[in-house]
């Protein structure tokens, strides 16, 4: 019988890109899930609903997949990190990158329901260290997207117009309804 590893991640996978991942300049869809983090830089005129979201760092997914191949027995494990909300992300980005404060979206407070998910079983069964914290994942994803943006600017892409583009904002919020237009 062949061993099977079936990844199931009911959360958003974020994290930095691999060094050889190439995104066509101006192609925001190429940012994939990192677009959610890039959306926080849409400017104060963009208002985000304060939704909670779970995440798993892409580096943790890779390690879990390899570890899953090596374990014996049948297991059902959830790949998830702690849940956080948009307001916490904005506050965290402000604390680590105060230079971005004028570029950050605003957040409308709403009531929060945070699902309870415990990654400790997966960590224990797979024999892995603690998963990447949401703060580290956000910081690394933010830096990766800013690096991409910097490369785009070098070849003439107007990053400001990308962030102001309602098509971009629609792509960012597709399925999440997390962008409220204020104009």
Where are each of the predicted segments found?
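Conserved beta-strand elements of beta-rich interaction domains across eukaryotes
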Residues: 12-13, 84
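Conserved sequence/active-site signature of Rossmann-fold short-chain dehydrogenase/reductase
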Residues: 13-15, 61
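A conserved pocket-lining segment of Rossmann-fold NAD(P)-dependent short-chain dehydrogenase/reductase
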Residues: 26-56
């Amino acid at each position: 019988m062949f061993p099977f590893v079936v990844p199931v991640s009911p959360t958003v996978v974020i994290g930095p890109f691999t060094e050889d991942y190439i995104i066509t300049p101006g192609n925001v869809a190429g940012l994939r899930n990192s677009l959610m983090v890039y959306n926080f830089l849409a400017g104060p005129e963009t208002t985000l609903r304060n939704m909670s979201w779970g995440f798993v760092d892409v580096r943790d997914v890779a390690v879990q997949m390899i570890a899953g191949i090596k374990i014996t027995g049948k297991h059902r494990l959830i790949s998830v990190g702690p849940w956080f909300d948009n307001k916490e992300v904005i506050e965290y980005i402000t604390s680590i990158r105060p230079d971005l404060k004028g570029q950050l979206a605003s957040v409308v407070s709403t009531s929060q329901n945070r699902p309870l998910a415990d990654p400790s079983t997966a960590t224990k069964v797979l024999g892995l260290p603690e998963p990447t914290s949401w703060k580290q994942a956000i910081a690394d994803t933010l830096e990766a997207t800013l690096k991409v943006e910097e490369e785009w600017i070098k070849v003439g892409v107007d990053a400001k117009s990308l962030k102001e583009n309602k098509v971009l904002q629609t792509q960012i919020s597709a399925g999440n309804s997390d962008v409220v237009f204020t104009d």
